[in-house]
Every structure is written in structure tokens, then in C-alpha cells.
Curated annotation (Swiss-Prot):
It comes from Escherichia coli O139:H28 (strain E24377A / ETEC). GO terms for molecular function: 3-hydroxypropionate dehydrogenase (NADP+) activity. This is Probable malonic semialdehyde reductase RutE. It is an enzyme of class 1 (oxidoreductase). Induction: Up-regulated by the nitrogen regulatory protein C (NtrC also called GlnG) and repressed by RutR. CDD domains: RutE-like. Its cofactor is FMN. PANTHER family: MALONIC SEMIALDEHYDE REDUCTASE RUTE-RELATED. Keywords: Flavoprotein, FMN, NAD, NADP, Oxidoreductase. It catalyses: 3-hydroxypropanoate + NADP(+) = 3-oxopropanoate + NADPH + H(+). NCBIfam families: PRK05365.1 (NF003768).
Amino acid sequence: MNEAVSPGALSTLFTDARTHNGWRETPVSDETLRELYALMKWGPTSANCSPARIVFIRTVEGKERLRPALSSGNLQKTLTAPVTAIVAWDSEFYERLPLLFPHGDARSWFTSSPQLAEETAFRNSSMQAAYLIVACRALGLDTGPMSGFDRQYVDDAFFAGSTLKSNLLINIGYGDSSKLYARLPRLSFEEACGLL
């Protein structure tokens, strides 16, 4: 049976973690990005489908390529973040299922239903984006996830001619706490949950 993590870990991962809009100039190494993926890839997905594909943008050139897709409110925070991750989903994720889910012919579940394939890829890549955020926090990094961008532009600029489609962006780095907004409320258990 698993043991609960420490209260300090819960604070780091959830209750004290914040969405950051400003960044310190401390770089994030490529090795750290590899560590992030090594953690997040173990999060569960439907039939182990693992549809997320991530582009970690670390260079000025990469950020300039992304710039036209950003909403005005997300521009400065993204250009100054050490890393911006494009979390995309592979519309043909099912081609990897013989490796990832060898227990049966899971590939045919999705080749026979394009709608199911798209819903599965989008939903599960969203879950994987959340795992990436938690992995960042576990390694001492801060994040700023965003959906305010031109997805079609990103798809054309970064994924043209491929089977990838963008889902969301996540800025990653070491946050500047002086630029945090006041903590916003969350819904109570009674407002968000039910018991049957």
C-alpha cells in the first residue's frame, strides 16, 4: 500500500504552488527538461495511449517564431520565460499502441472511429499537460499554463506536414514571486463535488 507524501510535498505540489507571470533569469537546463519528461510520462492515460508531444522552446529564435500566436496578455510573460512548452497531441497516436498497449488490438478502436481518436488524444494530452505541471513543481520549477494563443498559427508554424496539433502552452522556469497576483479563491468541496 502506498504511503501519503509529506505535508511539505503537498504544499509544493498543490497548496503553495502558484501560476507565475514573471521569471527570474535562471536558466532551465536541457537535462532538467529530460528529467521532467522522465517523471510525467508515467502518469496514466487511456490504454496507455500517451498522445502528448512536447516542444520545449528555449531559444530567442523559437520564441520569436511563437510570438505572433500569443495573445497580448500572454506575450511578455512568454518571451521572458526560460522555457515555453507547446503541449500538442498526435492525431495518429494509435500507431504506437502495439508497443504501448500490447494486450489487444487497441489500434483498431481508434482507426475505426476518427471522432473517438480525436477526443481521446485531446483529453489525454490535457491530462499529460497536468502531469508536466506537477513534475515541474516536484523539481522546484514554476509554471504558467496558457490557452490564450492562436492554435492554428502554432500548428502551421511548428507542426506543418505532421500529425500534431497544439493543445496548450506552459511557461516553465523559476518564478519571480514579486510579480505574483493575490491568490485567487477556489470552489469548496460542496460547490464542486457530490457524494452518492
